[in-house]
Amino acid sequence: MGKLDNKVALITGSDSGIGQATAIEFAKEGAKVVITYYSDEEGAQETLKKVEAAGSNGLVLQVDVTEEKEVERMFDKAIEKFERVDILMNNAAVNGQGIKVADMSTEVWDTAMKTNVYGYFFCTRRFINQVRKQGGKAKIINVSSVHEEIPAPGTAEYCATKGAVRNFTRVLALELAEEGINVNNIAPGMILTPMNEEAVEDKEVRKDQVQHIPMKRAGKPEEIGKLAVFLASSDSDYVTGSTYPMDGGLMQSMGQGA
């Protein structure tokens, strides 16, 4: 018997990396998974294959989370297929562009805000209203970053959005506590994902970055997935408003413990 039997989870950005790994871990625990992607349909279909190989069912949907109507359509399709959604993982995001504020275009700033903040808002609002309609307990898991606390020059737009996600999580936790909706936040550090490898292409630079991590290694996407299982299951029913750094001790080493 799995920890997520009879649950339906919707994970944005589940075509690769953390989202894909979490979809697989959820499926292993019995959850049906709504797999979403923006442009990588092949990756999303690969996630579906792995979800089915784990013995569960999935649904692949393309969505632009910055568009409110597309988010509404995504939820409508999910409900049409599975009749309910019990778990929302806000994971779809864009990375920092390595541009200092003085040189940053409004477009770069807006792209980060629309995806990393508005996307979370649109999905969360729709999810809350669906949970109220269907009844029962529910879980919201937001994915931020260690850069919610650790500043990185050249990524102001990214750091600002991740700080927003953390405080969004805390406010939601207080607003929804009496409704049986738990809201928590995962703050990944260096995780071996395609997105991070693309952001830092130089292997020597990545090797140097690892040396600043107390555990002296990067994390694996499935490690995030296993934490997400805890936050999505009844094991975490008395946990809300918390941030969980998954960073090998990086935030603690910089005096930035959550």
Predicted segments with their positions:
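Active-site helix of classical SDR
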Residues: 124, 161, 169
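Alpha-helical segment proximal to the catalytic Tyr-Lys
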Residues: 129, 174-178, 237
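Conserved glycine-rich cofactor-binding loop
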Residues: 8, 15-17
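Active-site loop immediately N-terminal to the catalytic Tyr-X3-Lys motif
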Residues: 102, 150-156, 178, 216, ...
